[in-house]
A protein has these predicted regions:
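Short secondary-structure boundary segments
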Residues: 1-2, 48
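C-terminal cap of thioredoxin/glutaredoxin-like
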Residues: 3-39, 43, 106-107, 111-188
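Structural alpha/beta surface segment adjacent to cysteine/selenocysteine redox centers
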Residues: 23-129
Length: 188
């Protein structure tokens, strides 16, 4: 009889460079374990900037308005850490964008395809956000990324054209608040 899998939940936001870095570090460590199949990893939603625009705007500009002179140092620090994980951040192209629909899509990936699909999609979303200048608030961009991950295009478009998954995302955000999660990434 096989042992039950240990669930690891990662509260994360696609808008967070430290979440991308943390994802890379975590999965490198997990993948190196002989017992990696004993773990089920699920991404949970967290919105660092729920008022971010859709379509997105230049991340550099939004950070400068929010954090002033500190924003450049923040990007340098995150960019330096990212390089160590094989991530090439492009702060000139990166956009600050609403991530609610990306979270709905990640929830759909987990629910209908499983944790492996969710992990694959999260990687593509993070790369689009920080390396490729993608707008993760755009239904077309989200659809393109989901299809590249292996999800059904019609199903993805159906989700994005509706409010489906909204309650689940909100419940995940409320659960994070109930657990006292105030920063991401957080691993539980």
């Amino acid at each position: 009889m096989s042992q039950p899998r240990t669930r690891i939940e990662i509260w994360s936001d696609i808008a967070c460079p430290w979440c991308y870095i943390g994802k890379r570090r975590f999965f490198r460590a997990l993948d190196a374990r002989a017992d990696r199949e004993a773990f089920e990893v699920v991404f949970r939603p967290f919105e660092l900037d729920p008022d971010a625009p859709a379509p997105g705007e230049p991340l550099r500009d939004r950070l400068a308005r929010r954090y002033g002179a500190r924003s450049e140092a923040m990007m340098r620090q995150a960019g330096g850490a990212a390089v160590g994980e094989g991530i090439t951040t492009d702060w000139e192209r990166a956009l600050a964008a609403r991530t609610r629909d990306a979270h709905r899509l990640l929830a759909l990936a987990a629910l209908e395809y499983g944790a492996t699909m969710q992990r694959r999609l999260a990687g593509l979303l993070f790369a689009a956000q920080f390396e490729l200048g993608g707008d993760v608030s755009s239904a077309d961009e989200l659809t393109r990324l989901a299809v590249a991950a292996g999800m059904d295009e019609a199903r993805v478009r159906e989700l994005l054209a509706s409010n489906e998954g909204e309650a689940e995302v909100e419940a995940g955000i409320e659960r994070a608040a109930g657990l006292g999660i105030r920063s991401v990434p957080t691993f539980v």
